[in-house]
Regions:
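C-terminal amphipathic alpha-helical interaction region
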Residues: 189-231
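Internal glycine-rich alpha/beta core junctions
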Residues: 1-206
């Protein structure tokens, strides 16, 4: 699915691409881009899996009716579509913030916090979406020819590359503590829709309460990031 290997260069010539001793700072921008790549990969994986599930349901009959016309299957497909569309929307928003970050402090701050939050949530949700979509195909989904097994095998990888769940959650906390403007940028963004739905307003309020006290927050970092992602 995604073959990996390790390469060792012996007696190779190398050039510094940044100040000596500042490797982490030099590479961090590359890491930001590859984290965005991971979000894109997960969103695409979710979308392909969802489309295959919908296509199958539109053509497969069971108990005398197409699967897509049966209420329980429609419910499952609706959940898949909503989650896939949300991942795609967030991915596009992050890509836009990345394009504008160099000349816009608000976008740069949003990108800093949202990239860590989205890397955690979207990449972690991809395997669950792939598994649910595979189930929609039944036994056919387990057959290699369906393409679903490959999606299922690939789906966990993006959550591991460029910082697994704990790393992404702790990076989000680091941004909140060291760059408080990232928190302001987050709330400015989500409050654009404030008032549209009381459930959204409650979710925003809950995140605000969670972030009001960042002392001893590390043990609940994953939960905080999950709440931010779901807003």
């Amino acid at each position: 699915s995604n073959a990996s290997s390790e390469i060792e260069y012996e007696n190779a010539i190398g050039w510094l691409v940044g100040p000596e001793g500042r490797g982490i700072n030099t590479i961090i921008e590359m890491v930001n881009m590859t984290r965005l790549d991971c979000v894109i990969g997960s969103a695409v994986n979710m979308r392909v899996a969802t489309l295959r599930a919908v296509h199958h349901a539109r053509h497969r009959k069971a108990f005398g009716a197409l699967l897509v016309d049966q209420p329980l299957m429609r419910n499952v497909l609706a959940d898949l579509v909503v989650e896939s569309d949300a991942a795609t929307t967030m991915m596009m928003r992050l890509a836009g913030a990345t394009d504008r970050a160099a000349g816009d402090e608000q976008e740069a701050a949003l990108r800093r916090i949202a990239l860590a939050v989205t890397k955690y949530w979207v990449c972690k949700r991809a395997p669950a979406v792939a598994a649910e979509a595979l189930e929609c195909l039944g036994g056919n989904g387990f057959a290699e020819e369906s393409g679903m097994p490959r999606l299922y095998r690939e789906s966990p990888l993006m959550s591991i590359w460029e910082g697994s769940g704990n790393v992404a959650a702790l990076d989000a906390l680091r941004a909140m503590v060291k760059q408080p403007d990232t928190v302001d940028a987050f709330f400015t963004e989500v409050r654009l829709a404030e008032g549209a739905d009381h459930r959204l307003d409650s979710a925003i309020s809950r995140v605000g309460k969670e972030l009001a006290d960042l002392e001893n927050v590390e043990y609940r970092a994953r939960r905080v990031v999950e709440l931010m992602a779901l807003v």
